[in-house]
């Protein structure tokens, strides 16, 4: 018999951005974690104990991926970190501490129980219904039908992470794989398909996480302004001709001389915003090295609103990773260590994680704007000189950070090197 496998499977989806009439609500948070305010006597929500750590972990993981992968990068920090934290519920003694510390938590300052309650609060808040933002997260456990999982683990996983458990027959690998892929396809409305790679007949458990995001721009792009063929410079040798959305609109942005990049904040309706980082030509590595929580906070304090001539690619990008080789490089080696104690999941049958599969999809466009052709949402003040507006032309590789504002949580982090790669 071959090795017994435990799998973590994470699937993410950021769906097309549609038209939404502009609302009258005020400016949102700037999209980077800000110091907590102590003016209110009400206790801070429990998710405040985990969201800064999720961001720190995401930046560490991104830098490691950037060293290994020359092309597009996309992953969901909330999805991946919550899945790893859920798994730690089944770890005992040193293994649990090592997993949580590897995510970046200081267990002296934030005990394990507070961490799990923080994730519970975060997932619950993100899952609250919103008329302007569709955000759906979920965890599912597929356990071999011959196993007798620990009831305490199943109860805690359901209570804290909303994880549902299903019995599976892994000896029928093809049928079970189809069952899991069908669930992902259903929960992501058919947008993420075939996310589960082939697994061994000796697999015992698949831990699945998915996140589905769909939102509308606060200031939509007019599809009639989109140029079907505009240059995008992947590098000094490769130039593409791609659809480029165009807009002159009020946005918050800045130029960071120290990092050599332009940073733009684009708001969605509802409680989400997108941070786009455009390095100067040849400065991508310099910008990536500067990606620190302090940098995000500094940007958040320096944004200024201005009329902007914006050119942004219309693109769809997907990324699939097997992270079992990457996660140990950011400290999560204990998940894969043969000495790891995960007996809290299945009692005496203690096995390590063999595979962490992660798939993310982002699709950004101006779809739906034709429904608002008469709404006049290019609402620049008439006194502004449109010809003198500063410009941000995303015609070369750039970074994207998608935030949920209420929780200050980083939903997606990525790099678009080739917007035509699909």
UniProtKB/Swiss-Prot annotation:
Residues 1-24 form the signal peptide. GO terms for cellular component: extracellular space. It is found in: Secreted. CDD domains: serpinA11 (cd19557). Its main location: secreted. Pfam families: Serpin (PF00079). Glycans are attached at residues 106, 169, 350, 385. Keywords: Glycoprotein, Protease inhibitor, Secreted, Serine protease inhibitor, Signal. GO terms for molecular function: serine-type endopeptidase inhibitor activity. Gene3D superfamilies: Alpha-1-antitrypsin, domain 1, Antithrombin, subunit I, domain 2, Serpins superfamily. SMART domains: SERPIN. InterPro entries: Serpin_dom, Serpin_fam, Serpin_sf, Serpin_sf_1, Serpin_sf_2. It comes from the Eukaryota. Residues 25-45 are annotated as: Disordered. Belongs to the serpin family. PANTHER family: SERINE PROTEASE INHIBITOR, SERPIN, SERPIN A11. This is Serpin A11. It comes from Rattus norvegicus (Rat).
């Amino acid at each position: 018999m071959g090795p017994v496998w435990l799998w973590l499977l994470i699937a993410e989806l950021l769906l097309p951005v549609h038209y939404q009439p502009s609302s009258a609500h005020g400016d949102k948070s700037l999209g980077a974690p800000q110091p907590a305010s102590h003016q209110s006597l009400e206790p801070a929500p429990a998710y405040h104990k985990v969201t800064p750590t999720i961001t720190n972990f995401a930046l560490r993981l991104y830098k490691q991926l950037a060293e290994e992968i020359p092309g597009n990068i996309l992953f969901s920090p909330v999805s991946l970190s919550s899945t790893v934290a859920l798994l730690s519920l089944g770890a005992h003694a040193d293994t649990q501490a090592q997993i949580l510390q590897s995510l970046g938590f200081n267990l002296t300052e934030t005990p394990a129980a507070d961490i799990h309650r923080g994730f519970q609060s975060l997932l619950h808040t993100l899952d609250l219904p919103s008329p302007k933002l569709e955000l759906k997260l979920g965890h599912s456990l597929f356990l071999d039908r011959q196993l007798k999982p620990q009831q305490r683990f199943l109860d805690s996983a359901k209570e804290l992470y909303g994880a549902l458990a299903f019995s599976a027959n892994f000896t029928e690998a093809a049928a079970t794989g189809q069952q899991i892929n069908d669930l992902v396809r259903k929960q992501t409305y058919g947008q993420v398909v075939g996310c589960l790679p082939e697994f061994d007949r000796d697999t015992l458990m698949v831990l699945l996480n998915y996140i589905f995001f769909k939102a509308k721009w606060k200031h939509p792009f007019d599809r009639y302004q989109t140029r079907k063929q505009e240059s995008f410079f992947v590098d000094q040798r490769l130039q593409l001709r791609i659809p480029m959305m165009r807009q002159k609109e009020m946005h918050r942005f800045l130029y960071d001389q120290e990092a050599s990049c332009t940073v733009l904040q684009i708001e969605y309706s509802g409680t989400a915003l997108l941070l786009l980082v455009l390095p100067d030509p040849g400065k991508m590595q310099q910008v990536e090295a500067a990606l620190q929580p302090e940098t995000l906070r500094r940007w958040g304090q320096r944004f200024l609103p201005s009329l902007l001539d914006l050119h942004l690619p219309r693109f769809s990008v997907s990324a699939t990773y097997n992270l079992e080789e990457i996660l140990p490089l950011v400290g999560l080696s204990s998940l894969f260590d043969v000495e790891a104690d995960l007996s809290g999941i299945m009692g005496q049958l203690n096995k390590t994680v063999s595979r962490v599969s992660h798939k993310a999809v982002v699709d950004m466009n101006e779809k739906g704007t034709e429904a608002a052709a008469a709404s006049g949402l290019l609402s620049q003040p008439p006194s502004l000189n449109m010809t003198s507006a500063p410009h941000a032309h995303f015609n070369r590789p750039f970074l994207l950070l998608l935030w949920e504002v209420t929780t200050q949580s980083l939903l997606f982090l990525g790099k678009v090197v080739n917007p035509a790669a699909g």
